[in-house]
Amino acid sequence: MQIFVKTLTGKTITLEVEPSDTIENVKAKIQDKEGIPPDQQRLIFAGKQLEDGRTLSDYNIQKESTLHLVLRLRGGMQIFVKTLTGKTITLEVEPSDTIENVKAKIQDKEGIPPDQQRLIFAGKQLEDGRTLSDYNIQKESTLHLVLRLRGGMQIFVKTLTGKTITLEVEPSDTIENVKAKIQDKEGIPPDQQRLIFAGKQLEDGRTLSDYNIQKESTLHLVLRLRGGMQIFVKTLTGKTITLEVEPSDTIENVKAKIQDKEGIPPDQQRLIFAGKQLEDGRTLSDYNIQKESTLHLVLRLRGGMQIFVKTLTGKTITLEVEPSDTIENVKAKIQDKEGIPPDQQRLIFAGKQLEDGRTLSDYNIQKESTLHLVLRLRGGMQIFVKTLTGKTITLEVEPSDTIENVKAKIQDKEGIPPDQQRLIFAGKQLEDGRTLSDYNIQKESTLHLVLRLRGGMQIFVKTLTGKTITLEVEPSDTIENVKAKIQDKEGIPPDQQRLIFAGKQLEDGRTLSDYNIQKESTLHLVLRLRGGMQIFVKTLTGKTITLEVEPSDTIENVKAKIQDKEGIPPDQQRLIFAGKQLEDGRTLSDYNIQKESTLHLVLRLRGGMQIFVKTLTGKTITLEVEPSDTIENVKAKIQDKEGIPPDQQRLIFAGKQLEDGRTLSDYNIQKESTLHLVLRLRGGMQIFVKTLTGKTITLEVEPSDTIENVKAKIQDKEGIPPDQQRLIFAGKQLEDGRTLSDYNIQKESTLHLVLRLRGGV
């Protein structure tokens, strides 16, 4: 078709184009005709600046449409956009770009629709029709991006006098907006207001939805204490900075003051007091930081990295993080991607539940590590705690509360510091980082509270070489603590240590006093035989069990160990590793299961069923299956019946290709469902997919894969829904129902991935 391009001088150029031509192609055609380099061209249609990677049809540009050509002002510039998760996006813009243009660029980079974006600069929300220069936004300025949530609601604000104020708000209102509404109602200036929710001081720039404040939530209003004070900040170089602060200043405020004095950006600062990393949203008074206290300043390690988070549904999320990110930050990033509130998230790594205030580097989580995400069970319950004096305390808890939370509740009721509490259930000492549900503590269970004996003592540890190590311990130290002390002295990892006393191997969760180990007792240290190893078994409830095994153990042996720990009969256990169901008679080494591998435990559903498999020749095969059978199992049954090797089978249900490691129930395949069997063309191959951000993804495909299959693989890797993906090859947009071979896409071809504009054609 023909289109016209009108320049500012009034000249009109005629171009021959196709709807699938990209803006980049159009600029190349203009360069051919007029000699203007593409990087100096800006094309405008219907008041919108057109982006290089998009096509004419994306913008509904039809035959004889007229585009306007504007030459770029020299003075393109970079700006930064900071999200609530702390991630910073860099954008190439011009002073004349509208806020709408900027939101479109953010959509291209992050996939967030413009109508869900609110941009804030200098405390002001920016309007779509205005330009960056209208707001005096200059190069390297930082905008803040807040996500809009839909729908108004009422909340309550309770003052210290007991008065309750009702406010009309939206989830996307900032705390600053809320304070302005309070000023309208009560006349209290915003800078004298501190708002508290769930024990946390709320920050001006954050929104109600950031804090999970929902309809009819109650905030508490506290007036700021007047009264400044000095504190000191000590850097790693030994330099001490003096700051003027107020007890009500947030850690974020303090970091801003440090930036003013020292030029260190807040996102590179970590502040430590009393051994604890301080969180941005808390105040100095929350941490009991008083006049002339000294904080320690540590610079964040540079070096972003990717980690993976695996959910119980098998979905894997990729996150951009830094080693210095706290677990709380990671949960906020997961909330941004998946919408799961942080208080419903439990993150597990190496079998351990991760605590909010600790950092990734504290847990030695490195690039491409995989965390496991378990959702907290809803549903409060009462438990009882019995003290040695016979007194019984009643506590309101949730199954997902950690032992640490429970000790804090006991401290609230009884005033006993957590570090003096030991909680016992079913004869076992409970560990701080574990949850009530990990120990199967249910409603109306009774825990026993024992106070830790004060008073350290020395014990000796004798190694097989005859060397004797002296340790300072307390009777209430766990065996795990003792192993950590040995690691500090001797460098032997705890998982290679076995401690023996009175002929008995000591268990990690028990204490020295449980074994009657007294001062000057001698323990014997034996190193674990190589070949002995730990593996993890993850259940569908998210619980992780640790087993001591050897590579030569059979799957049958492993099931027996699980029965010992969990009481589940072996014939109800199915173990899955690397997407494969493990057979009883084989060994761990047969499956290349190594130390710290994670197996998945699925309980067998009682009740087989029949399904049908229809081939391209029209033949229908009947199979006996269970909902818990994997697709791999089904292919093996087809091989038994028809002799077709599994690697030549592709199974389709409801238009979707089924993956080997998933089960029939994952795909909601029920009795008498019909699957379709397609034979694979020989010849898997790799192709590349390049995104507009420049990232390249590698995919394993076959020439017979449909474009729909390819989009599903991209979703698995990148989390981008297929309906937001457009794939371009050789300048053409690829259609879902066609195959790679239809488009002559061969091994190592590169496709281009463009995100769909909402409402595009």
Curated annotation (Swiss-Prot):
Keyword Ribosomal protein included in the entry's annotation: no
Presence of the UniProt keyword Membrane in the record: yes
ADP-ribosylglycine: residues bearing it: 76
CDD domains: Ubl_ubiquitin (cd01803)
InterPro entries recorded: Ubiquitin-like_dom (IPR000626), Ubiquitin-like_domsf (IPR029071), Ubiquitin_CS (IPR019954), Ubiquitin_dom (IPR019956), Ubiquitin_ubiquitin-like (IPR050158)
Domain Ubiquitin-like: 1-76, 77-152, 153-228, 229-304, 305-380, 381-456, 457-532, 533-608, 609-684, 685-760
UniProt keywords, alphabetically: ADP-ribosylation, Cytoplasm, Isopeptide bond, Membrane, Mitochondrion, Mitochondrion outer membrane, Nucleus, Phosphoprotein, Repeat, Ubl conjugation
GO CC annotation: cytoplasm; mitochondrial outer membrane; nucleus
Site feature (Interacts with activating enzyme) residues: 54, 72
GO-annotated biological processes: modification-dependent protein catabolic process; protein ubiquitination
Chain positions of cross-link Glycyl lysine isopeptide (Gly-Lys) (interchain with K-? in acceptor proteins): 76
Residues carrying Phosphoserine: 65, 141
Gene Ontology molecular-function annotations: protein tag activity; ubiquitin protein ligase binding
Chain positions of cross-link Glycyl lysine isopeptide (Lys-Gly) (interchain with G-Cter in ubiquitin): 6, 11, 27, 29, 33, 48, 63
Site description Essential for function, residues in chain: 68
Coiled-coil intervals, chain numbering: none
Propeptide residues per the UniProt entry: 761
Family statement: Belongs to the ubiquitin family.
Miscellaneous comment text of the record: Ubiquitin is encoded by 4 different genes. UBA52 and RPS27A genes code for a single copy of ubiquitin fused to the ribosomal proteins eL40 and eS31, respectively. UBB and UBC genes code for a polyubiquitin precursor with exact head to tail repeats, the number of repeats differ between species and strains. For the sake of clarity sequence features are annotated only for the first chain, and are not repeated for each of the following chains.
Name this polypeptide is given: Polyubiquitin-C
Lineage: Eukaryota, Metazoa, Chordata, Craniata, Vertebrata
